[in-house]
């Protein structure tokens, strides 16, 4: 009986420790559940983000699959170089575009239709301008008015350097392209260059250089604007035309070009 009484007295002393252990185990279980929920929520959020990324990337991939004329991946404005020249050719600034196009048209009419010579025209313009300014400056002494303010004209250095740098890059690119064509590596480029030069020689025999330059300017002012407006229709027709050209080229390559012996540079490139 004494032992049982002792055991009953000692058992309540152990209850607080047991309660602490039970509380700690409960806290651990709760923390595990919270972590498990956090991981599941983070995984679900990451899954949602992945779904969003895939859904957002899907239209991009579809857009990249759309055929663009000449393999173009940038807008027409960027293809033209961007900045002021592209704005002029795309008629973004209508006053500037109209002024440039009108000035080119007047110059073409004067030199081609009226058969003016450039040096003669410049001399006549300078004679008229100097005579008007000289008479005006002397007439102000008699009519008691202020003389004309003739502005000082300075050609800035930076635009000329940029123009020269751009021309240098394009000339070097053209020379490297001609070198690659002449090396016999690509017969398609060779035939394209021959056909282009042949067409230019025919046009040069029919029209003067100034007329050809004016035609090129008219095309620059009209074709990009038309293409930007009807881009999808032009690209669809261009895709059909390119597919037909590839078929015809494949037939021509199988019958003719494949039988032509290739140069040593082509063999080295394959190795």
UniProtKB/Swiss-Prot annotation:
The modification N-acetylalanine is found at residue 2. Pfam families: Reticulon (PF02453). GO terms for cellular component: cytoplasmic side of endoplasmic reticulum membrane; endoplasmic reticulum; endoplasmic reticulum membrane; endoplasmic reticulum tubular network; Golgi apparatus; plasma membrane. Residues 85-271 form the Reticulon domain. The chain crosses the membrane at residues 95-115, 116-136, 206-226. GO terms for molecular function: mRNA binding. InterPro entries: Reticulon, Reticulon-like. It is a multi-pass membrane protein. GO terms for biological process: endoplasmic reticulum tubular network organization; response to bacterium. Plays a role in the Agrobacterium-mediated plant transformation via its interaction with VirB2, the major component of the T-pilus. This is Reticulon-like protein B2. The gene is RTNLB2.
